[in-house]
From Swiss-Prot:
This is Deoxyuridine 5'-triphosphate nucleotidohydrolase, mitochondrial. It holds the Pfam family dUTPase. This enzyme is involved in nucleotide metabolism: it produces dUMP, the immediate precursor of thymidine nucleotides and it decreases the intracellular concentration of dUTP so that uracil cannot be incorporated into DNA. It comes from the Eukaryota. GO terms for molecular function: dUTP diphosphatase activity; magnesium ion binding. Its EC number is 3.6.1.23.
Length: 179
């Protein structure tokens, strides 16, 4: 066997031994985050476990566990009666359901669930229409999307590098496509 193959085989086996979850050494015992499941606890019998509407859906539907009315041009809080353990390395983003936004002018806000939050998940609903919007028990009001995050430490500096854009914001680049 050529020397390159011997070294490759040796390092490959060593890497496998160091990175397996059942190794008996203290060098590298880090279990990867589990993105296959997430824990959910029902806080009432009216709570509904989040589900995806289709195999390709990005979000898990969140349902209201209580009846409520979102007043015209107002807001309301829809409680799901769920505790959700968001996997480490991610956060849960509460996003609008496209059908509610398009058909009923219902949007949602304040949509971040941190991985260490363990309270009842609530959905802030905004009604941008001229009529009150009724929510029944079990109605799907939002969707939960898991997103990976990076949490670097802030570093205070005296200067920040300049860019071509600079401080321009809020439409400073225009609406036309740049050629």
């Amino acid at each position: 066997m050529p020397i390159e193959q011997k070294y490759f085989s040796l390092f490959s086996n060593l890497f496998k031994r160091l990175t397996t979850n059942n190794n008996n050494n203290n060098y590298l015992k880090m279990a990867p985050p589990n993105f296959e499941t997430f824990k959910v606890k029902k806080l009432s019998d009216k709570a509904i476990i989040p589900q995806r509407g289709s195999k390709g859906a990005a979000g898990y539907d969140l349902s209201s566990a209580h009846e409520l009315v979102v007043p015209a041009h107002g807001k309301a809080l829809a409680m799901t009666d769920l505790q959700i353990a968001i996997p480490d390395g991610t956060y849960g983003r509460i996003a609008p359901r496209s059908g509610l936004a398009w058909k009923n002018f219902i949007d949602c806000g304040a949509g971040v669930i941190d991985s260490d939050y363990r309270g009842n998940v609530g959905v802030v609903l905004f009604n941008h229409s001229d009529v009150d919007f009724k929510v029944a028990v079990g109605d799907r009001v939002a969707q939960l999307i898991f997103e990976r995050i990076v949490t670097p430490e802030p570093l205070e500096v005296d200067e920040i590098d300049e860019t071509q854009r600079g401080a321009g914001g809020f439409g400073s680049t225009g609406v036309k496509v740049q050629n």
